[in-house]
Amino acid sequence: MVVPALIYMFFNYDKPGLIKGWAIPIATDTAFVLGILSFFSRHISLELQAFIIGFTLIDDAFALIILALFYTKTINTPALLISSVIIFILFILNYRQVKQLFYYIIVGLLLWISMVESGIHGTLCGAIIALFIPVNIKGEFNTSFKKLENLTRPFVNYFILPLFVFMNSGILLEYFVFKGTCSNSILALVYGIIFGLFVGKQLGIMLFSYPFVKFKLCNLPSDTSWLKFYSISILGGIGFTLSLFIGSITFESSCPSNSMRAAVIIGSLISALFGVAVLKYCTSKE
């Protein structure tokens, strides 16, 4: 997350109107990365799968936190206090190991309303609710949790995610050709996002992982070479939906907004194609 943000800032440090987009390339689209890796499932060990899910979810969680902390324009203090009380109620439900989903749905709906009214983006609400739904109750797996997952997964995969992509990637093809006075003034925005996603993500993951393995603080996942691990780090540059979402909140005027969308799509596609090519090469040798 740090390296993509720094690369974006390098291109835009002297542009006050554009520097605020530093959070756009930090996110990883978990759904798209896992979708691509599903085609290579036979060659991806369980340990590597756990690492992939872990770093993509952590990326998304921090992106939501950054969204709440740095992209909130005004704070409604009374509504924020109400949100805090509702979160405490969720804590009590979890502590008492209440497994009925009805209570979490009702309390979650109230939390969403209060958070939106407080000025904090409502997307953070879903992450908070998920933290408090108990997975294990008295040492046994919570079947209600599994039912909720099974109930929402088709709806999310086949309706919410495609709709989200469609609504957030509404750009004209002409914006893929960066020309004209508008484009010239924000070319640094485009470079910052593309290089942040494609170069920043892989560089960040490798720079933070290699020293830990080198000094034996941790090990590579089983059946994983450095080249295969590198291919996963490249796929981390698929920002797509969450990057588009952060960008749409950051830039409201049409010129930077459309250029931002084109840059996110280009950076994500380059990361996907190059990552798949390297991963395909690795698996062909096995």
UniProtKB/Swiss-Prot annotation:
<keyword id="KW-1133">Transmembrane helix</keyword>
<dbReference type="Pfam" id="PF06965">
    <property type="entry name" value="Na_H_antiport_1"/>
</dbReference>
<feature type="transmembrane region" description="Helical">
    <location>
        <begin position="101"/>
        <end position="121"/>
    </location>
</feature>
<feature type="transmembrane region" description="Helical">
    <location>
        <begin position="21"/>
        <end position="41"/>
    </location>
</feature>
<dbReference type="InterPro" id="IPR023171">
    <property type="entry name" value="Na/H_antiporter_dom_sf"/>
</dbReference>
<keyword id="KW-0997">Cell inner membrane</keyword>
<keyword id="KW-0812">Transmembrane</keyword>
<protein>
    <recommendedName>
        <fullName>Putative Na(+)/H(+) antiporter NhaA homolog</fullName>
    </recommendedName>
</protein>
<comment type="similarity">
    <text>Belongs to the NhaA Na(+)/H(+) (TC 2.A.33) antiporter family.</text>
</comment>
<feature type="transmembrane region" description="Helical">
    <location>
        <begin position="75"/>
        <end position="95"/>
    </location>
</feature>
<feature type="transmembrane region" description="Helical">
    <location>
        <begin position="262"/>
        <end position="282"/>
    </location>
</feature>
<feature type="transmembrane region" description="Helical">
    <location>
        <begin position="122"/>
        <end position="142"/>
    </location>
</feature>
<dbReference type="GO" id="GO:0005886">
    <property type="term" value="C:plasma membrane"/>
</dbReference>
<dbReference type="InterPro" id="IPR004670">
    <property type="entry name" value="NhaA"/>
</dbReference>
<dbReference type="GO" id="GO:0006885">
    <property type="term" value="P:regulation of pH"/>
</dbReference>
<feature type="transmembrane region" description="Helical">
    <location>
        <begin position="158"/>
        <end position="178"/>
    </location>
</feature>
<keyword id="KW-0472">Membrane</keyword>
<keyword id="KW-1003">Cell membrane</keyword>
<feature type="transmembrane region" description="Helical">
    <location>
        <begin position="50"/>
        <end position="70"/>
    </location>
</feature>
<dbReference type="GO" id="GO:0015385">
    <property type="term" value="F:sodium:proton antiporter activity"/>
</dbReference>
<feature type="transmembrane region" description="Helical">
    <location>
        <begin position="186"/>
        <end position="206"/>
    </location>
</feature>
<feature type="transmembrane region" description="Helical">
    <location>
        <begin position="229"/>
        <end position="249"/>
    </location>
</feature>
